[in-house]
Amino acid sequence: MRSLLPLLAAFSLAYAADAPAPLAPTKADVPYAGTSDFRQTLNVYGPAAKPAKPAPVIFWIHGGGWRGGEKTTVQLKPKFFTDLGYVFVSTNHRYITTTPMNEIFADIAKSLRWTHDHAAEFGGDPNRIVIMGHSSGAQLAAYLAIDERPLKAEGLSLSMFKGCVPVDADTFDVPAVIELATANRKAAGKPEPKYGHREIFGGKPELWTDYSATTHVAAGKGIPPFLILYDAAAALTPDQAKRLERALTTKGIQAKAFGAANTTHGKINSDLGLPNDPSTTEVLSFLKTVLAK
């Protein structure tokens, strides 16, 4: 076994040397809420070449169960999107352990306010934003693209969005996921978690409903087109993706739920930007359509 260690070490070094270096932000740790709280900062990645005309902006919200995650955990996405000529913004938000859900919504709205006001400095178009996120960040992205109230508090409107791409979230319809998760746990003989969706979303049924993106879907208020990505083999996210798709399409809003095969909750996110990745192909097709309008 010892004789293999030098070979394994050499392989690891070679692999690390071949792996692309993460793209450095054009501007890092930008405060967006007038505070010194690191959780209320964002990173901006500008396109390598100055665009001939204002570029679309990809606004990304990290996952982490609303109580973890970091704006730097973006894998391939900054390089992938800036190579396409887009501006890429990745935001932090305060955690649910210190901040209620409605104030997390407000954090994202403030971050969008900063992005809208400063996008042009990086070659971006403040009125051509596509909001995206993974897991809990996907729930936040969908909510901000559907319920206009957090944006309105910042003097913004849904018209700033050209599209929304939530990636593998299970909380677009909070009462429904609580019901399904409870049934799954009972069937498996598992206890309820001490700090689950009930607690994260305010502990009251009326808040579970209000914090659900599906509750606020309505025609005629400017909700952008949606591409809803999910792991086709997951326990909860397929049902939630289809619920959101159905809520949108029944109101005449463009939406497509795409279930990726042979993936996981983490992989569907980290693979975004890889050649021949099915979810990436869907994203590129979606962007081509919505940004042409």
Residue ranges and their predicted role:
Residues 3-14:
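Bacterial N-terminal signal peptides
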Residues 17-293:
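Alpha/beta-hydrolase superfamily serine-hydrolase fold, recognizing
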